[in-house]
Each structure stands twice: as structure tokens, then as C-alpha cells.
Amino acid sequence: MMLRSCYRPLERCFGKLRSDALMWHMDLKPHSSGDFSIAVVQANSALEDQGQVISSPFATFVGVYDGHGGPEASRFVNSRLFPHLHKFVMEQGGLSPEVIKKAFDATEEEFLHLVKRSWTAKPQIASVGSCCLVGAITGDMLYVANLGDSRAVLGRKGEGRGGSGGDLEMKVVAERMSTDHNVAAEEVRKELVDLHPDDSHIVVYTRGVWRIKGIIQVSRSIGDVYLKKPEFSRDPLFQQFIAPVPLKRAVMTAEPSIRSRKLRQQDLFIIFASDGLWEQLSDQAAVEIVFKHPRAGIAKRLVRAALHEAAKKREMRYDDIKRIEKGIRRHFHDDITVIVIFLDHQQRSSRFNKLSSFDCTSAPVDIFSLNSVEAEDTLRSRG
């Protein structure tokens, strides 16, 4: 009983921790121009995804950071990118693609300094990185910036005929708002080949997928310093942990793709998610799930739909996957972060009055620790 009362404040702060022990979710919460829903499921031994929503009376900011090689880079981006963005917004007097790029550049530069400071004690930090997806809604403008293969997909009203050519009925249309920087796409491979005409191994098909230098699938990120700064990959200290990578120049960048457009009345919602979701669901399938179901818990519903698909591919049930422990579960699906932002155009002015200050919602750094026996033991030891 006492343990349960200890957990109640955790649930109020972080959301619900039920059913799937590796899933966390917050069903519904207001932002400056609507509601949002967020859910995360952990597959790796340490959660490598991070997600956050920051809302003020005048703007909403969304971040999804999908780490690789470890959780350090995504956690770093989670703590540093929005402070940089806020600083440049204040300096420049507003949000713009240039301001967003400055924030990405500053975050990359700060992480590089961290790697240099930590290098001798932890050389592996040069091999960690993170995809970075950011959305910003201010007034009637939407900005989406991306590094890597997390994705933002907007759902907007469309019309179509009912069955057998019947009356027009309201449908939802998926509009991709971000650019995937993954060498699975032919245009990304071509871009790399054009940039590295003297390197016949710049993109290699290995272990069933295309990879840069046979190592990594994404071409843009925060971190991955050893693939951006050749001196790190050549250092004997680093080579104790990772095989040397012969580089003449950087093979990855931190140059974000940025898109901005005015929001329209037919724009209903935006799904921001790490690639763990998009590996299992198409853009159209995802927006139809959101369109056809209640708002509360919709991010959790999307995550569960993805997990059902992952289970089906292995001729399993989702209930079977739920029983698999962290780490081993990564063989069945990736960490998944989903944030659904609803756009209530007519309610924007009333929302301003309800949100009198900044409100930040972040997914837990590690979900397993919030659900585990170790967490219960820790609470008992403090009691």
C-alpha cells in the first residue's frame, strides 16, 4: 500500500506506467493551440529515444531524439537544443529557419566539445549520435527541422467517395513534413556518391541494408564525431574499441532539412515519431488511426499498432512481445517515441489564457527503471 502511494506522484508527473512494463504514456494534455498525446516504448537495454513538448501561451515546440550507439547523444540533445533555440529566438526577435539552424549548429558544436573533454576517459563517446526531429508552431506557422530518419507527418482533411461511388465523405490525407536522411533512399545514396566520387565504399550494402562505410544508415545527425572528424577514427585510443574507419573527410553532417509552411483550416494534427514507428506503419496508416479514434491515449494506440505489426512479422502476438525483457526485445522492434499534436485553429485564443507560462513535458530518461523490481527495491530502501 505504501509503495503504491509512492508511485502515485510518479504517475502524476510522468504519466501512466501500466500494462506493457516497457511502455510509458501521457494520454492528453493541452498546448498553445490544441491538445497533445505522447507515448514511448523501450526496447534497448538503455532507452535511446528521448521526447519532449514545450508549450507557452504563444508557441509549442516538439522534440523527438532517436539515439544510436548509446543514450548519451539523445539525452544531451534533449537537455540542450531547446535552450539554444530559446536563446536565438530572443536574440533574433522571433522564429525562422535561420534561427532553428543556429540552434542545431550550437548543439552539435557543444556536443563536440563534450566529446573532446570526455575523450581520454570514455573514447566510445565519439561513436554515439542522435537523429533529431523538431517541430515548432507559432501563430499560424509550422516549422519542422530534421536530422536522420525520425519523421513528422501531418494529417489534413480530404474528400473521397464512399463505397460503390457513393456520396462524398470526409477522409484524412497524410502529408510528410520532414525529409528522411537514410541511405535506404536512393536519392540519399546518390547525394553521398556525388559528394565522395573518390570513395567506392562510401555506401555499402551489408547485413540486409545500405550503410555509410558499412556502418550507419542515417547520413545526418548530432554526434557520430568519429564519422565527421577523421582524427578521432584514426586515434589508437579509439581503435581499442572500434575498428578503424579510413576517412579522407566527413561522411556525415549536422545540416538539418528545414521546412516551414502556413497552417490551414484543413490541417488536423501532426504525428512526430522516431523511425521505430515508421518501420512498422505507413504514413497513411498512421494518420488514419489518429483520425478514426478518440484523442485521449492516441499516441499509445499508435505505438501498440506498431508493436502488433512487429509481432505479426515474427508470427507472434503483442502479448508475447510484452513478456520479452529490455535488450533482447530490441531484436523484435526498436525504441519508439510518438507525439501527436492536435491543431484546434478556432480555440487558439482561448488556449492562450489557459497556458500562463511555459510548460515542459518530457518522457522519462529510462522507462524500465520506472517499472522494474529495482525501482521497487530502491523505494523500499528509502522508506
Segments predicted by a language model, with ranges:
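PP2C/PPM-type serine/threonine phosphatase catalytic core
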Residues: 1-383
